[in-house]
């Protein structure tokens, strides 16, 4: 059996770029709050940013070509008649935005905006939010080990029903993209061996060779020896997003991480990772990969090493205290229904 979680070649922005402006939240967030994305666009302005290479879902399907032609102010930017907003991205049709994304990706790859910072390795992520410090390891998964069909018992499985109609627009965005900017989080059931982790605080370089021996709390163990790793970034995140640090896991340490997760895979009983966030993004990656396999354009040997076979994800521990599981639905009691509906209508109109 091949490993389903593997090292990657990972790109980041060059050192001259403001990372606080470079980093934006996942594209499927704030889908009913246009003011949030307007503020992000204003804050980023003309600076290099991942805002320019993602498609916030709030804008999907909102502007047709005819509407764009009618509302354009002549500079390619639509004036919103109701709010007076003037934003570049709120004015684009889906096709225009996707073309812009693909072009900008190519530009970032050729003009030095992006550079490879990790070769055949991983990134250890430390994300501070209101709920605490969440740790993760970024690497590649094999999409042949994942399926969003609940009937398939794969190593990597979805945690929510996939809305098939949501996949085609995402496929259109992904299929010609030169780079991948994921927000997919996978959860591993890996109870933390606190005694072993506490014992390696202040660790020295040799402790990296012990990662493969860790049976429980792989991510937490790597974090405990983070001072032996090369720091890649350390920045505040915009719009109250918290703080983030990243460390390169390379060389022997990367080999040890691969071995540790391979051992976890062997003992998991056939279910290693659950998709905690980004279900539809990963379903889109899977769909693109299946389309490539069915295209007949590649030999079996070529498919084995095709880049679309893999997706970049962050592995997080299900046992992390910083993970909060909240219900999607809310029950309102003792309210006047008409007043409540009027309030909701007024709030939506503001958007």
Where on the chain are the PLM-derived regions?
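Structural beta-strand/beta-sheet cores of well-ordered domains, especially the beta-sheet scaffolds
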Residues: 49-51, 182-184, 271, 308-314
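A generic local secondary-structure boundary/capping motif
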Residues: 171-176, 265, 272, 301-302
């Amino acid at each position: 059996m091949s490993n389903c979680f593997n090292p990657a070649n990972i790109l980041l922005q060059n050192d001259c770029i403001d990372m606080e402006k470079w980093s934006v939240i996942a594209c499927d967030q704030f889908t009913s709050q246009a003011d949030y994305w307007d503020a992000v666009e204003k804050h980023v302005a003309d600076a290099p940013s991942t805002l320019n290479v993602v498609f916030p879902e709030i804008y999907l399907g909102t502007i047709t070509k005819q509407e764009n032609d009618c509302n354009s102010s002549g500079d390619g930017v639509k004036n919103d008649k109701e709010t007076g907003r003037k934003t570049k991205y709120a004015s684009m049709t889906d096709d225009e935005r996707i073309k812009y994304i693909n072009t900008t990706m190519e530009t970032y790859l050729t003009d030095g905006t992006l550079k490879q910072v990790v070769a055949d390795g991983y990134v250890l992520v430390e994300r501070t939010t209101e709920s605490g410090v969440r740790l993760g390891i970024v690497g590649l998964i094999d999409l042949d080990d994942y399926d969003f069909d609940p009937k398939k018992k794969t190593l990597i499985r979805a945690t929510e029903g996939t809305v098939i109609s949501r996949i085609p627009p995402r496929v259109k965005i992904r299929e010609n993209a030169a780079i991948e900017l994921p927000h997919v989080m996978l959860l591993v059931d890996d109870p933390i061996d606190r005694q072993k982790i506490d014992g390696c605080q202040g660790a020295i370089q040799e402790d990296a060779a012990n990662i493969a021996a860790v049976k429980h709390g792989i991510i937490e163990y790597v974090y405990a020896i983070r001072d032996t790793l090369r720091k890649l970034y350390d920045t505040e995140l915009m719009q109250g997003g918290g703080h983030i640090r990243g460390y390169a896991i390379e060389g022997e340490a990367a080999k040890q991480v691969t071995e540790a997760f391979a051992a976890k895979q062997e003992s998991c009983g056939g279910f290693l990772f659950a998709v905690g966030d980004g279900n539809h993004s990963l379903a889109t990656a899977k769909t693109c990969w299946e389309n490539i396999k069915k295209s007949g354009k590649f030999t079996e040997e070529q498919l084995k090493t095709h880049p679309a076979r893999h997706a970049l994800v962050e592995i997080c521990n299900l046992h992390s205290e910083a993970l909060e599981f909240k219900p999607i639905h809310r029950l309102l009691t003792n309210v006047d229904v008409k007043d409540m509906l009027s309030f909701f209508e007024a709030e939506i109109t503001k958007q």
